[in-house]
C-alpha cells in the first residue's frame, strides 16, 4: 500500500512487534507508590539484564546495538519471546520490582501498566516506525477486490490497542475482531466502499504471533469475510517465512510489515519480489521500557 513508508524498529523489530500467550492483570494498574526497593544502582537491581523477545527480531538487534553504543559492558540481553517478556513484566509490576524490557507501541502493556520509555539520546532505536501492507505480485489482477480493500485498510494505534486489549482480557481473536468491526461500522464501510464482493473466493494471509499482528490480521479477515464474502485462511509463521511466503506467491499478503527498521533486512532482500501498498498504521515506537515507579529516565542512566 504505497501510501507512504516500515514491522519501526528495524521494529522490524518487530517487532514488534508479540505473542498473545501471556495473561494481563485485571483492569488498569496504577503505578505503585513505592519505587525501587532494591539497594544499589539500577544494574544491580535488575542483575544487569534487559528482558528481550524473540532472537533475531529487529528490536533485539537494535537493543544489541544500544548496548554497544552506550557502552553497557556488563549488561545482558535475555532472549525469549514476547509472551515471556510480558509475563516477566506483569510479575515484576505486581511485586513492585524493577525491570527493564524491550518495548514497542502499540502494545497492550502500555495501557495496562504505567510505563515509560527510556530516553535514547544517541537515536539507536531510530524514528517512529510504520506497519505496512505487503501483497504478492499479481494480486491486483487476480484478486482485484482483495487488493482494493488491502490498499485502503488503514487504522490508528488506538484502534489496534482496543482489539489487543480485548484479546489479552480473554476474548478469542476472531471475537475481538468481530466486535471491533461492529463498533466501527463507519470506518469499515469506508474501507470497502465501491468494492465488489468476491463471493467465496479464497485468500491466504500470513502473520507473526505478535499481539499487534494477531489483532490487525483478524480484523482484516473479518472484513474480507463479512463485507466482501471471501474465504480467508490465516497462516501464523515466523517473520522470515511470512516475507518469503508473500514473495514467492504462496501467501496472498500480510498487514504485518514493520518498517523501516524491524523488517529492514527482509525488505532489502525481497522488496523487488513483492508489492508494498504502504503503511496501514503510523506512530509505532521501539525502545527500552520500565515501570514509571523506577527512578531512571535515560539509557545512559544504566551506566551508573
Where are these regions (language model features)?
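Short helix-initiation/N-cap motifs at beta->coil->alpha
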Residues: 77-88, 210-211, 231-245
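Pocket-flanking alpha-helical
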Residues: 86-93, 107-116, 217, 239-271
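Bacterial signal peptide processing site
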Residues: 19-22
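Periplasmic-binding protein-like
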Residues: 110-151, 278-287
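Short, well-ordered beta-strand elements
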Residues: 40, 44-52, 150, 199-212, ...
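C-terminal motif of bacterial Sec signal peptides marking the signal peptidase cleavage site
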Residues: 13-17
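A conserved helix-loop-strand patch within extracytoplasmic ligand-binding domains
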Residues: 31-51, 136-138, 148, 154-157, ...
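Immediate post-signal peptide segment of exported/extracytoplasmic ligand-binding proteins
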Residues: 24-47, 182-205, 301-304
Amino acid at each position: 500500500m504505497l501510501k507512504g513508508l516500515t514491522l519501526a524498529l528495524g521494529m522490524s523489530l518487530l517487532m514488534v512487534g508479540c505473542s498473545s500467550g501471556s495473561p494481563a492483570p485485571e483492569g488498569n494498574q496504577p503505578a505503585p507508590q513505592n519505587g525501587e526497593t532494591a539497594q544499589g544502582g539500577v544494574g544491580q537491581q535488575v542483575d544487569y539484564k534487559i528482558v528481550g523477545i524473540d532472537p533475531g527480531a529487529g528490536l533485539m538487534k537494535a537493543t544489541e546495538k544500544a548496548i554497544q553504543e552506550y557502552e553497557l559492558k556488563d549488561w545482558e540481553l535475555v532472549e525469549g519471546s514476547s509472551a515471556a517478556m510480558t509475563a516477566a513484566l506483569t510479575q515484576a509490576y505486581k511485586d513492585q520490582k524493577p525491570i527493564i524490557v524491550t518495548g514497542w507501541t502499540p502494545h497492550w502493556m502500555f495501557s495496562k501498566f504505567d510505563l515509560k520509555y527510556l530516553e535514547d539520546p544517541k537515536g539507536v532505536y531510530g524514528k517512529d516506525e510504520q506497519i505496512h501492507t505487503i501483497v504478492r505480485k499479481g494480486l491486483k489482477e487476480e484478486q482485484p477486490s482483495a487488493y482494493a480493500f488491502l490498499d485502503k485498510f488503514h487504522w490508528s494505534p488506538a484502534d489496534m490497542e482496543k482489539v489487543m486489549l480485548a484479546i489479552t482480557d480473554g476474548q478469542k481473536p476472531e471475537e475481538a475482531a468481530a466486535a471491533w468491526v461492529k463498533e466501527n461500522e463507519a470506518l469499515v464501510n469506508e474501507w470497502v466502499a465501491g468494492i465488489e464482493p468476491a463471493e467465496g473466493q479464497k485468500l491466504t494471509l500470513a502473520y507473526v504471533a505478535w499481539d499487534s499482528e494477531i489483532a490487525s490480521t483478524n480484523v482484516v479477515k473479518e472484513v474480507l469475510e463479512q463485507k466482501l464474502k471471501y474465504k480467508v485462511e490465516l497462516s501464523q509463521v515466523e517473520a522470515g517465512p511470512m516475507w518469503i511466503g508473500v514473495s514467492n506467491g504462496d501467501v496472498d499478503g500480510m498487514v504485518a510489515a514493520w518498517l523501516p527498521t524491524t523488517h529492514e533486512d527482509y525488505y532489502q532482500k525481497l522488496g523487488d519480489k513483492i508489492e508494498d501498498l504502504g503503511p496501514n498504521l503510523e506512530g509505532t515506537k521501539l525502545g527500552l521500557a520500565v515501570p514509571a515507579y523506577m527512578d531512571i529516565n535515560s539509557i545512559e542512566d544504566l551506566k551508573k
